[in-house]
C-alpha cells in the first residue's frame, strides 16, 4: 500500500524514530468482514492476500478444561514483491458490538475455528493443516498423523487419537466473529503515520469503525531493554506511573486484558543487590509476569522469546493515524527515557494535577 503524503500535523507534531509495529483493533460493518478490507488493501498496492490462521485462547465451559485454544481465519496482505503490508485477524476481546448486532449464521463464508485444549497440539495442527481447506477436509492431515480418520459430527469435524481422546475439532465460526478486525502492521522504520493512514483510511471508507473495547498496541524492539538499569526503569514507569499514563493517553476503560504489573516485579527492581541480566530476567519470570498487562514484558524476560519486543497495550482505540502517532510519540519518548540509567522517579503531586505535563517533563519533552 502506497503511504499517503505526510500531513502537516504529523510533520510538525509527532514523528517516531523507533522501529515500531502497531496493532489497531477495528470492527467491520454488519454484513462485511475482515477479508473485505484485506482484498481492498491488496488491490490498492497490486499485491495479494494469503489465507492463514490466528492463534488465540478463551475460557472453556468444559469441566476440567481451563482454556480452549483455537485457530481462526486470518488474512496476510503482501505487496507485489511479497513484502508484508498488514495482517488482519480476529480479536476475541471485541464482544459488545458483536453482541448488540443481529448475528449472522455460523460459518460465514464457510469459515471455521479449529479448537484444541493443548497448546503443543495446536501448534502441531497449525503446522500441518491448510488454512484455506474446507471444514470437512481441514483436519485430514492430522488424522493421518495419528493413524485415524476425520469424524463428521453435525456441522463439525473431529479427530481423535487411537485411544479415543480428542486431538482437535473444527467448528463453524460463531456468527459475528467475522467482523472483528485487528490490523497488525509489520515493523515500521519510517513514515509511521503515512503507513498507518494507508491502512486505516481504506478501512474507514469501507465502513469499519472503532469497537467499544478497542485498544492500540505498540511493539518496539526488546533488546535495548534487556539490561538491568533499562528494565528497572521500564518497570518503574509502568508500575509507578499507571494512573498518569492512563489519564494522559486516554486509555479505554472498557478495554479488556489490561492489568498493573505484579507488585513482586515492582519490588524486585528496587532491591539493592547488584545482579546481571540473566539473573534478573529469571527472577522476573517468577513474579507472575503476564502478556495481559498494561505493558507486556513476557517476551523480554523469556528464555526463548518468540517475538523479541516490548508491547505497550494502553493506547485507546482509534482509526486515525495522526492520533495514534501522537500518542505513540509520547510513549516512545518515555521508553527512550527508560534507556537512561538514571532511575525513573516516582510521580509527584504534579502528576495528579497535570498527568500529561508530568509525563512530558519526565520524557524531556520541551514545554
Could you say what each language-model-derived stretch is?
Residues 2-209, 223-367:
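C-terminal accessory/tail domains of diverse enzymes
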Residues 213:
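Active-site histidine-anchored catalytic micro-motif
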Amino acid at each position: 500500500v502506497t503511504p499517503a503524503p505526510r500531513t502537516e500535523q504529523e510533520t510538525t507534531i509527532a514523528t517516531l524514530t523507533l522501529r515500531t509495529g502497531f496493532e489497531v483493533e477495528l470492527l467491520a460493518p454488519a454484513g462485511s468482514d475482515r477479508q473485505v478490507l484485506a482484498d481492498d488493501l491488496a488491490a490498492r498496492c497490486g499485491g495479494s492476500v494469503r489465507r492463514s490462521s490466528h492463534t488465540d485462547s478463551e475460557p472453556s465451559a468444559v469441566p476440567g478444561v481451563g482454556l480452549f485454544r483455537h485457530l481462526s481465519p486470518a488474512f496476510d496482505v503482501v505487496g507485489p514483491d511479497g513484502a508484508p503490508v498488514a495482517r488482519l485477524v480476529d480479536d476475541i476481546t471485541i464482544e459488545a458490538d458483536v453482541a448488540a448486532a443481529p448475528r449472522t449464521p455460523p460459518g460465514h463464508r464457510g469459515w471455521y475455528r479449529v479448537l484444541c485444549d493443548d497448546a503443543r497440539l495446536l501448534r502441531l495442527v497449525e503446522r500441518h493443516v491448510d488454512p484455506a481447506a474446507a471444514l470437512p477436509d481441514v483436519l485430514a492431515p492430522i488424522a493421518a498423523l495419528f493413524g485415524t480418520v476425520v469424524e463428521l459430527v453435525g456441522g463439525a469435524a473431529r479427530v481423535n487419537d487411537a485411544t479415543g481422546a480428542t486431538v482437535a475439532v473444527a467448528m463453524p465460526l460463531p456468527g459475528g466473529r467475522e467482523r472483528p478486525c485487528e490490523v497488525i502492521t509489520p515493523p515500521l522504520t519510517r513514515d509511521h503515520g503515512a503507513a498507518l493512514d494507508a491502512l486505516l483510511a481504506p478501512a474507514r471508507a469501507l465502513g469499519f469503525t472503532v469497537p467499544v473495547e478497542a485498544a492500540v498496541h505498540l511493539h518496539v524492539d526488546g533488546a535495548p531493554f534487556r539490561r538491568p538499569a533499562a528494565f528497572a526503569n521500564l518497570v518503574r514507569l509502568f508500575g509507578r506511573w499507571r494512573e498518569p499514563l492512563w489519564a494522559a493517553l486516554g486509555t479505554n476503560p472498557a478495554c479488556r486484558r489490561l492489568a498493573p504489573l505484579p507488585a513482586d516485579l515492582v519490588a524486585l527492581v528496587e532491591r539493592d543487590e547488584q545482579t546481571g541480566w540473566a539473573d534478573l530476567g529469571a527472577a522476573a519470570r517468577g513474579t507472575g509476569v503476564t502478556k495481559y498487562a498494561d505493558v507486556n514484558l513476557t517476551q523480554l524476560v523469556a528464555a526463548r522469546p518468540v517475538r523479541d519486543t516490548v508491547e505497550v497495550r494502553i493506547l485507546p482505540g482509534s482509526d486515525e493515524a495522526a492520533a495514534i502517532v501522537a500518542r505513540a510519540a509520547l510513549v516512545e519518548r518515555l521508553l527512550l527515557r527508560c534507556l537512561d540509567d538514571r532511575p525513573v522517579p516516582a510521580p509527584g503531586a504534579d502528576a495528579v494535577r497535570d498527568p500529561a505535563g508530568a509525563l512530558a517533563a519526565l520524557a524531556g519533552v520541551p514545554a
